[in-house]
Amino acid sequence: MIQECVMDSLNLNKHISGQFNAELESIRTQVMTMGGMVEQQLSDAITAMHNQDSDLAKRVIEGDKNVNMMEVAIDEACVRIIAKRQPTASDLRLVMVISKTIAELERIGDVADKICRTALEKFSQQHQPLLVSLESLGRHTIQMLHDVLDAFARMDIDEAVRIYREDKKVDQEYEGIVRQLMTYMMEDSRTIPSVLTALFCARSIERIGDRCQNICEFIFYYVKGQDFRHVGGDELDKLLAEKDSDK
């Protein structure tokens, strides 16, 4: 898990105030701490769902409050920096990217909470085949989250591009699970309630890939200074190439 990370310099401008640099580094470090918390929450939620571990699920649900509190604290720190330092250019982009990133992390934390609340209410050991498929999808998105946090720590745009494309594989895996679940439902109508719950969980997990993709877009924005939201893969390649040629 990325709980402790040596933050790279990112070529931050040398400010007259060393305190400003310290404040920027502080909030970046806090983002990584929050990211590590969320990654652990998600991993525990997937484990609790697969193993039907009610004690672990309860700890995940309880831990969501800590994630929420950290989001608020980091957001408040961002507001203080903007009000006090009036950052511009890449410094302002960094503060904005941090504020947006923690919102995505908080939503991923909410998914972990929902998985625990929903799956433990509906599933039993007889539904183990459903849980195996959901665990596989969950582990895939956990790896995406781990990788995007690492890319964020280094503001590594090449790694961000790779992770951005990885979401297609998550989508394909999700679609395969949906087909499998529909087959279960057609073969045995008694599975309908549990299948519907599994579909809800699968969709929630799939959305984590989208959240990671959003964080990739924030990395693009910080490094390139251009908003890359709502572009497809081919258009993304073109825009990134154009920005590189402008150097």
UniProtKB/Swiss-Prot annotation:
Main localisation: cytoplasm
Swiss-Prot/TrEMBL keywords: Cytoplasm, Phosphate transport, Transport
InterPro entries, sorted: P_transport_PhoU, PhoU-like_sf, PhoU_dom
Localization (cell): Cytoplasm
UniProt superkingdom: Bacteria
Disruption phenotype: Has derepressed alkaline phosphate activity, especially under high-phosphate conditions. In single-challenge murine ascending urinary tract infection (UTI) experiments, quantitative cultures of urine, bladder and kidney reveal no significant differences, however in competitive colonization experiments, the mutant is significantly out-competed by the wild-type in kidneys and urine and recovers in lower amount in bladder.
Keyword Cytoplasm: yes
Claim: Cytoplasm is one of the keywords in the record: yes
Gene Ontology annotations for the cellular component aspect, listed alphabetically: cytoplasm
GO molecular function ontology, one term from the record: protein homodimerization activity
SUPFAM superfamilies registered for this protein in UniProt: PhoU-like
Disulfide bonding pattern of the chain: none
GO aspect biological process, one term: phosphate ion transport
Function: Part of the phosphate (Pho) regulon, which plays a key role in phosphate homeostasis. Encoded together with proteins of the phosphate-specific transport (Pst) system in the polycistronic pstSCAB-phoU operon. PhoU is essential for the repression of the Pho regulon at high phosphate conditions. In this role, it may bind, possibly as a chaperone, to PhoR, PhoB or a PhoR-PhoB complex to promote dephosphorylation of phospho-PhoB, or inhibit formation of the PhoR-PhoB transitory complex. Is also part of complex networks important for bacterial virulence, tolerance to antibiotics and stress response.
Quaternary structure (record): Homodimer.
Family per record: Belongs to the PhoU family.
The protein, known as: Phosphate-specific transport system accessory protein PhoU
Organism lineage string: Bacteria, Pseudomonadati, Pseudomonadota, Gammaproteobacteria, Enterobacterales
